[in-house]
């Protein structure tokens, strides 16, 4: 089982605040996510600028595409994104369109499982050639005190068994990682737990050490 990668979510409102994070921890993570908030605040230039600064890193545009899959994904890939996200409620043809464009750029598409989705949809994504999903505990669920539970673990295992590469996100803390031991997680996303730490560098390194211990 390969080691899960570590992704930092830049859910900043401005490039200046995003740079404050990347200057510290870009070399400690595998994937730099241009979060939805930053995509809206700064547009695709955020993707272009971060990829120019860190060409050796995977840069994800978390656009959460809901429609116009080909147009929006092309905008992201032409800005040199490696991956883009499509929201789970999007029509299957939106996901297919985004994937077609991704292939032109040797990129990839992730289905963001935020909100309601079904296992029937999941099978449609697999049948369409989608390989990646993001299992998401929403900000609102976190704020309501909803913790990771057995239902989450069961769903993640089932997605993995279907052949998906699963990314896990949603207020992920260091102490949550052992919950997922034994599951071939593709990526763990940490946002505030790294960005807002007293030492973001040490926080990122702690995540990497824990991942190596649990999956190594």
UniProtKB/Swiss-Prot annotation:
Its cofactor is Mg(2+). GO terms for molecular function: 3-dehydro-L-gulonate-6-phosphate decarboxylase activity; magnesium ion binding; orotidine-5'-phosphate decarboxylase activity. The lineage of its organism: Bacteria, Pseudomonadati, Pseudomonadota, Gammaproteobacteria, Enterobacterales. It catalyses: 3-dehydro-L-gulonate 6-phosphate + H(+) = L-xylulose 5-phosphate + CO2. Belongs to the HPS/KGPDC family. KGPDC subfamily. SUPFAM superfamilies: Ribulose-phoshate binding barrel. NCBIfam families: PRK13306.1 (NF009832). It comes from Salmonella typhi. Homodimer. Mg(2+) binds at residues 33, 62. The gene is ulaD. Pathway: Cofactor degradation; L-ascorbate degradation; D-xylulose 5-phosphate from L-ascorbate: step 2/4. Substrate binds at residues 11, 192. Keywords: Carbohydrate metabolism, Decarboxylase, Lyase, Magnesium, Metal-binding. Induction: Induced by L-ascorbate. Repressed by UlaR. The record marks 64, 67 as: Transition state stabilizer. It comes from the Bacteria. Its EC number is 4.1.1.85. Binds 1 Mg(2+) ion per subunit. This is 3-keto-L-gulonate-6-phosphate decarboxylase UlaD. One of its GO terms (biological process) is L-ascorbic acid catabolic process. Catalyzes the decarboxylation of 3-keto-L-gulonate-6-P into L-xylulose-5-P. Is involved in the anaerobic L-ascorbate utilization.
